[in-house]
């Protein structure tokens, strides 16, 4: 859980926080990348893996693969991408992007597609898409935007193992990085009804660790059973918004109570559960 307070509000109290609009371009790149791998599924390594000296990895063919990718419907059946944690009775799941079969070991590797665009104008400031790209920032005050990527890979490996598969600790992030440096534009002058964006590609290995997942589910169940909302994490944006709104509106509260509430909101401190960032 990124924030126990937000998790409780969403899962126990049914509070819906303002949503973000969908990123259709990102979704479309995921769709196209899967189609790339579908052409080689169960047969041979895709050229992107051959280029990265991973020709022993081929797209995994399984009758339930399409169900595994359906994040919205992850809990519909046991054939979807979920598992029930018996100790907490939490059905835990989501939608994965793809799976590779290691023809040398027989193990599976979880694959996560990612699309990005580095907007720095100075080419020297463009980060290389390698293992260091996924690491936490060296400055602890900087936000760790890749933490959710790493956690998701950890969780998906845990689920896949509980579904009875032999899964390697090594997962792969397949990145496409939209280019702009040195580009005049994207509209095709010979056919102005068309536009093109060029992407650089990368395959980044990540050694996952799912040892924390079961404890996190136990903590989640304990949080769900609380009668009152627990404290929010330090720096929680939702907590700050709620506290500021209460303070601005002063709804049925004295100033001293509002100040105390604002302070409180910013201090750390069978159920279906989709993998997310609450």
Task: Give the location of each predicted region.
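Metal-dependent nuclease catalytic cores that hydrolyze phosphodiester bonds in DNA/RNA
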Residues: 1-108
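Serine-centered coil/turn micro-motif
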Residues: 20, 46-47, 142-147, 235-239
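Non-catalytic, well-ordered alpha-helical scaffold segments
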Residues: 31-35, 154, 234
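Amphipathic alpha-helical segments that form well-ordered structural scaffolds
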Residues: 36-39, 155, 159, 219
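Metal-dependent nuclease catalytic regions and adjoining charged, substrate-binding loops involved
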Residues: 159-278
């Amino acid at each position: 859980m990124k924030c126990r307070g937000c998790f409780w509000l969403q899962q126990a109290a049914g509070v819906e926080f303002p949503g973000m609009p969908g990123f259709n371009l990102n979704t479309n790149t995921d769709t196209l990348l899967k189609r790339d791998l579908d052409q080689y599924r169960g047969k041979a390594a895709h050229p992107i893996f051959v280029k990265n000296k991973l020709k022993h990895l081929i797209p995994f063919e399984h009758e339930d693969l399409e169900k595994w990718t359906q994040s919205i419907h992850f809990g519909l059946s046991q054939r979807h991408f979920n598992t029930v944690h018996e100790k907490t009775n939490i059905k835990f799941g989501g939608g994965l992007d793809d799976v590779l079969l290691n023809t040398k070991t027989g193990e599976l590797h979880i694959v996560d597609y990612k699309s990005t665009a580095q907007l720095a104008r100075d080419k020297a400031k463009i980060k290389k898409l390698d293992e260091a790209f996924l690491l936490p920032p060296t400055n602890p005050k900087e936000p760790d935007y890749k933490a959710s990527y790493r956690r998701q890979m950890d969780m998906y490996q845990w689920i896949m193992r509980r579904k009875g598969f032999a899964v390697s600790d090594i997962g792969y992030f397949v990145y496409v990085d939209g280019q702009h440096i040195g580009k005049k534009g994207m509209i095709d002058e010979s056919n102005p009804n068309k536009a093109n964006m060029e992407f650089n590609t990368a395959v980044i290995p990540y050694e996952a660790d799912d040892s924390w997942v079961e404890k996190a589910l136990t903590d989640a169940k304990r949080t769900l059973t609380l009668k009152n909302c627990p404290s929010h994490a330090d720096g929680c944006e939702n907590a700050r918004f709620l506290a500021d709104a209460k303070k601005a509106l002063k709804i049925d509260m004295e100033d001293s109570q509002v100040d105390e509430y604002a302070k409180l909101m910013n201090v750390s401190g069978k159920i279906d559960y989709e993998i997310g960032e609450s």
